[in-house]
Amino acid sequence: MTPDTPGREVEIVRAGPLTTVQDRGRPGYAHLGVGRSGALDQPAHRLANLLVGNPPGAATLETTIGGVALRALDGPVVVSVCGAVAPVHVDGRPAAWAAPVYVPTGAVLEVGPAVSGVRSYVAIAGGLLAELVLGSRSTDLLSGLGPAPLRDGDRLAVAPLPSAFPAVDPTPVSAPADSLIELAVLPGPRAEHFGAEAWRTLTRAEYRVQDQSNRIALRLGGPVLARQGPDSIPSEGAILGALQVPADGLPILFLADHPPTGGYPVIGVVPDEALHHAAQAGPGTRVRFRAANLGGPGIAHL
């Protein structure tokens, strides 16, 4: 069988508030108006795949706060759950988080509500086989590309099991911070629209994640960032990690499903390496921005 030949199926018993299929996303298509999408917490996504012997870019399930339940239909599966810490059970029996878990044929894997963080990643050995769109199986909520968000009763094909499982370092995995995160920020392409006082406010004040946040962006509440230029600008390309400031002066941090263009000035950019922290920040989480320099510690690239 080829890598894309279905080996088994799993059934979604409980989809939770929002469960989507995600992988590395669709980088490189911004010039066509297509955003990157992909798993918001890429390190957790990669670790979940590693634990079950998958390539790091294999598709996983990304849950949001409420978890998910799935049944192994026509053969056993090996799964792992990483990212947001959540209770894991197989047919009601406790199972491990951030470790390989065997799910027999007909059994139900239950990932409960997150107790630390927001998004859990469920990898299944072999990888999920949702349709490829522009080289990715990811759901993009803004554009509608990729598979629709999962519903109860949906079935997903799983590729055949890998021939061997790798040895994995059993070092404990840290739980996501659930009360305060600190994000590095670089000056943005429209920083000149803001005075020095606005930059000081951004990098010294504390913000809180608002309820309206989603895979498109983190909306932040806190001190207003006063600008010296116009409230809006002609639409221009937007990137992952951009801190856009609309007319109300409250920053919005673009995440994986962000729009390809934006019409408000971007005061700063959070580098890719820090965005997994933002992926696990739920409503009420405190956020601090730390001024950074391109090429400085922890800043590999944008």
Located regions from the model:
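Conserved "landmark" site that anchors the functional core of diverse proteins
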Residues: 1-302
